[in-house]
Amino acid sequence: MPPSRATTPDGVVLALHDLGGDGPPALLVHATGFHARVLGPLAHSLGTRFHCLALDLRGHGESGVPPNLNFDWAGFGSDVLTAVDAFGLVGAVGVGHSCGGACLLLAEEARPGTFSALYCFEPIVFASGALPAPDPSAPLARKARQRREVFSSRQEAYANYASKPPLDVLHPDVLAAYVEFGFEDLPDGSVRLRCRGQNEALMYEAGLRHTAFSRLDAVKCPVVIACGAESRSFGRADFGPVVKRLANARLEVLPRLGHFGPLEAPSAVADSVIRDLDPRPT
């Protein structure tokens, strides 16, 4: 199904996706560098309990880029609110991965009461009061700028990613969706990443400066902060201050998963979401 479109207050045209399912609405928000369709396998597993909707954040997938390439994460929060309004959601649940989890919190802070509950898997929210200046040499930003963007075909791209870290841990259906919908066709027959490396680097740099942590007390809905027991990015201790600052939150550690948990084991994460957020008896 082709995406619908909605325009943010600052003029970014977003791609919105109906990922299917039956039940109360759930808005799914992807991580930096990915796009809504990689959450398709998660949505499939959630589909017996939730009607899953999603968006491509600015600079990702089929969405446009912001004016002057300003990737301040407040804009991501605005993207979420634009999607909420375009879908006509009232009291939906939100499920976010990494950057997507932070975006849900930013959106709820900006407009309290937007969501009835949130499930945030390793959200990029830091308990530091310091806001470091963007550092172009930071590892994630540097790697994004160096990332190969063009392949001869989607088949070559898939084989490349499946053969080495970090994307070799992704569920095959997730990786297939990442490649199928994350590349655009070029006139010479080759394909190029839609989320350009320079833009992704700017997103990582801006991710060090958002202020979600300082405003967590505005979030009153129930929140589950989930993390992977095998994550090399974050651990239980990193999220303790976030859980403590939220009014109604708890931490859940999922065994055998890393930072890519929702993309590694969509069904396991879906089971966790259903246990935590679905009010209907199992």
Which functions belong to the PLM regions below?
Residues 41, 53, 57-95, 99, ...:
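Active-site loop/oxyanion-hole signature of alpha/beta-hydrolase fold enzymes
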Residues 15-65:
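Conserved HGGG/HGGXW glycine-rich cap/lid loop of the alpha/beta-hydrolase fold
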Residues 148-206:
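Conserved alpha/beta-hydrolase catalytic His-Asp/Glu region
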Residues 263-275:
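Post-His helix in hydrolase/transferase enzymes
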Residues 90-133:
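Conserved hydrolase catalytic core segment
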Residues 254-266:
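Catalytic histidine-centered segment of alpha/beta-hydrolase-like enzymes
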Residues 183-244:
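Conserved serine/cysteine hydrolase catalytic core
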Residues 29-31, 97, 227:
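The conserved beta1-alpha1 loop
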